[in-house]
Amino acid sequence: MSTKNEQLFLQAKKHIPGGVNSPVRAFAGVGGTPVFMHKAAGSKIYDTEDNEYIDYVGSWGPMILGHAHPKVIEAVKAAADDGLSFGTPTTFETSVADIICDIVPSVEMIRMTSSGTEATMSAIRLARGYTGRDKIVKFEGCYHGHSDSLLVKAGSGMLDIGEPTSQGVPADFAKHTITLPYNDPQAIKDCFEKWGDEIACVIVEPIAGNMNMIVPSQEFHDTLRAQCTQGGAVLIFDEVMTGFRVGLKGAQAHFGIEPDLICFGKIIGAGLPVGAFGGKREIMECIAPMGGVYQAGTLSGNPLAMRAGIAMFEDLTVEGFYEGVADKVTYLVEGIQAAAHKHGIKLRSTKLGGMFGLFFVKDEATGVPQNFDEVTACDMDKFNTFFHGMLDRGIYLAPSAYEVGFMSSKHTTEDLDATIKAADDVFAEMSAAS
């Protein structure tokens, strides 16, 4: 990448740890120097030298309307003119709450936060307060933010108490977290048989978007719902990535499962800093000031994010919106898959709604990965080569083999064809080099 980016990265490292404010941005997984972006519009982002890239990161999901959508920008400007934040209730947060509760059947009440991490952290505290239990269950490869309870991996045995995955997380704290393999119904049954009456909640990405993209089996979700109901545990769907991305009603509608609590991310504010958690009324009424579970935030429900979200939902609720985005994903993924086959590249893919995943497997017998171990067994070197080849051709993918891709309504057929052509060129080079 250009000397300009190297200079900017060096400058950033002077006062920002690692030069970034979120680790994946550092390109550690793919190597090289991160590209410093300057502006964005529609399906494109532009670096500091005004080079154009077709963007499939979309600020990690929320830009489903594309960047700088005129309606959203107009709403944000109007909100800013009226004052950035009040520290009081506003009608705008009520409007967003009404919209979400009207759309998502499992959400009877909802509380705004300022991030997805706050949403998952608060949902877990609420589940513990509601049940009077301490233990929580999560799954390998699922990411739910950086709160201490969730930076935990499985112990030496599948049903062992968890071990911290980050320095600074006390082992005594991590012992309350049980980590299971994703997409494994039997592991859920075994866990509840051993710990059932101690489990406060199970938190899960209903479709995993942090080990690339894994769409689990229906049996996995049916088992989760049945075991949580039987064991009196709260089922939490973390739809920070999938909410309003795979469909208007999220992944829960795809599987026909109603969780007890659900977490949303910045998509509900059209990309501004915001999150939310909601669910059954009897659980949500345990939150202060109604109940004894404390949760608060000075900027929760801030007017900029709320008014941006209201503007965004006007488009999301138009009939056919999600079908249009899904058609774009299908066109792109099928085109890339055909190009890979043409050049003998062993590529597997997944897709649903506005999300897609690409996996470079090591042999023809290997199918689409179904869990974290199978994702880690993929050919990361080939992904890294593919990533940089696409970047050099003006295609911006997530700089990690463990991240999902996102489509927007603003991606054109020309964008998709250019992306497929770039992939074809990169695959040709990869094939010639092997």
UniProtKB/Swiss-Prot annotation:
GO terms for molecular function: glutamate-1-semialdehyde 2,1-aminomutase activity; pyridoxal phosphate binding; transaminase activity. Pathway: Porphyrin-containing compound metabolism; protoporphyrin-IX biosynthesis; 5-aminolevulinate from L-glutamyl-tRNA(Glu): step 2/2. InterPro entries: 4pyrrol_synth_GluAld_NH2Trfase, Aminotrans_3, Aminotrans_3_PPA_site, PyrdxlP-dep_Trfase, PyrdxlP-dep_Trfase_major, PyrdxlP-dep_Trfase_small. The modification N6-(pyridoxal phosphate)lysine is found at K266. CDD domains: OAT_like. Keywords: Cytoplasm, Isomerase, Porphyrin biosynthesis, Pyridoxal phosphate. GO terms for biological process: protoporphyrinogen IX biosynthetic process. Its main location: cytoplasm. It is an enzyme of class 5 (isomerase). One of its GO terms (cellular component) is cytoplasm. Its EC number is 5.4.3.8. Belongs to the class-III pyridoxal-phosphate-dependent aminotransferase family. HemL subfamily. This is Glutamate-1-semialdehyde 2,1-aminomutase. The lineage of its organism: Bacteria, Pseudomonadati, Pseudomonadota, Gammaproteobacteria, Moraxellales. The gene is hemL.
